[in-house]
Amino acid sequence: MKKFIRIASVILCAMLLSALLFACNDNGNTDKPQLPEHDCNHTCPVCNLCVDPTCTEKDCANKCSGHVTPTAYKISLDFVGGKVDLHTELQQQCLDDTLYMTTSYANGSKELSKTNELKLAWKTEAVTDNANTVIDYTVKLTTDPTFNKDVWTFSSFDNDVNVHSLKIATKYYWRVTANLDGGATETSDISVLVTAECGPRMINVDGVTNVRDLGGWQTTDGTRVKQGLLYRCGRLNKSSSTTVRVEITDKGKDFMLDYLGVKSEMDLRMVSNNEVGGLTYTSPLGESVKYLPCPMDYNTSNLIIGNHEQIVRIFRYLADPSMYPMIFHCNIGTDRTGLIAFLVGGLCGVPEDTLYRDYLMSNFGNIGGSRTVFTIQDNYVYYIKESDGETLAEKTYNCLLATGVPAEHLDAVIGIMTGVAIGA
């Protein structure tokens, strides 16, 4: 009898254990069949069934019954092929020609420094009945494939948006989100576009002429100077005015602050004669931007010798990573601004002819007269090249050392602008 009870107990325990295992294995699986993997990318995370009513994949015949709201719209991005170059036809013709022909394309008498815009377009197709109305679109454009940093955001009521001032030689990612009535959204897949390598990167800022990125140029050792850190431009407010008369528009301010992310403005205009136009402590961009007056004399036969104290101050600011992104300018963003651009570029290893090319592009700005290579050769380039060194980079480094700029500041600027740590 006892033997029978023990056998019955074992059988009962086995039955209970089997039932328990079945319950555990079956938990949640009645709603989540293990379907073969497929590529439609529209599967419900609850039941693993396809939620796209337009999907015709063989393994997607069975559709989700409602765990996820079906896609209301399909957004298809227009492909941007080739390498995008936003220079105008006139700018490109000039860049393709010799340095000495620049003034035959632009002579500094009118505003020609703005570039073309790129239209990003898409198509929107309703794929369900009674879909909520599209209110507007949000477009995100970034160099980060995860869309977690450096994102430019645009809004549009139409199926396109115009963008400009893109970095050169750069891969961009973009996507579009439709914002629907009621708060729902639909987001497109990600598309990619690539910009051409042709410099300089010219920037469109409403109310400011002659805006360019010092980055993008290749150095003699193949390094590319970082973009998005240091911008040269013309003035933001009217020079020599007794009261501050801001010339950059609200649209221009928004672009500098929201898209370029400007943190500091270095003003090279004279203070003693009020060339700064009444500015004292606050940038025309607002109190969030550090205003750094570095008054340089423009009436001197050698801009380096005549402004050595300010050059030391300027490179102290340039050596501080917290100052970036930074804009710097004089009155029209050409001569004193051109000197600092030449010194920074030369220090980083940008070839001499490339530095001339960048300087001469100021002729496309409204600068009140033309400039040639000889303008800066006689003023400071020959002076720099008299310094010790085999290369222009070495000569620029030693010239600035002799001017009084500490080596640690020069090394810091090179590191910031190229990502190459000196002595590493």
Residue ranges and their predicted role:
Residues 9-10, 52, 226, 330:
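A general, composition-driven signal for non-globular sequence regions
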Residues 20-23:
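C-terminal motif of bacterial Sec signal peptides marking the signal peptidase cleavage site
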Residues 25-32, 63-327, 339-424:
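Cys-dependent protein tyrosine phosphatase-like superfamily
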Residues 332, 336-337:
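Ser/Thr-glycine-rich phosphate-binding loops at phosphate-binding pockets of nucleotides
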Residues 1-12:
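Bacterial N-terminal signal peptides that target proteins for export
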Residues 17, 29-64:
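Thrombospondin type-1
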